Amino acid sequence: MSDISHENNGYSQESFMKLARTGPATSLTMNDRGLSTVIGTNRDSTGKPISSKTKYEFNRLRTWDQRSKSRKTASFSKAFTLLHGMKTKLGISNNVVENAAYIYRKVVSAKLTRGRTMSSLIAASLYAACRENNIPRTLDDIAKVGNIERRVLSRDLRTIIKKLELNLNQYDTSSFISKISNNMNLREKTKRDAFKILSLCEKEQITAGKHPVAQAAASLYISCIMNGEKISQKKFAVESGISDVTIRNRVGLIKKTLKLIE
């Protein structure tokens, strides 16, 4: 496959030909970054079957091509297959996945793979990429789709952050309000009021150091009460992955500070 669309600003035939190129875009999520040659099977460039002699020669070329690939390349291929599977389940955009692949390549270059599973490291890289791009996905979300224990994922994430000196910002709590409310099909007014509650909490400086998901769930719970939507704290706990005790404590603090509801 070749990308033959124009990608330059050549305004004469000579300048256009100097700047022109063909070929698909490269990607960090490919084990070879999309730069290697792929040997086709049993058909020529026009789609016609090739002769038995040519088929035998190409089979030998294909065999040696596979043998020449390093263990590192094979490892990348397996890791990025896992990454694409997680991307599909989590509904994450390509630029975040590219970022995750970049982080994972740095993990391999730093030789952090010893004693750690590939699935956990690729999942930790994906979580770090989500944090860098403020995509609201929790450790529990990543652990679930990656079929990994949360404590193992958390441990490997701490290692990656420390060794690679990543500077991950805290999540924007408002993004979790949108995520939880959409998943629970809450009314638009309930969501808007939850944003207002969050804004008031930030002005009162009671959000610092608090779990953003718990803060979002508590704001939505209070907003539901104000708008007559009867949803239990237990349901919010299940949907957000936060214990109902934590949500109850956050709700109590918000009610006491803002005096919104009795």
Descriptions of predicted regions:
Residues 1-262:
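Non-catalytic, interaction-prone regions of core transcription and DNA-replication machinery
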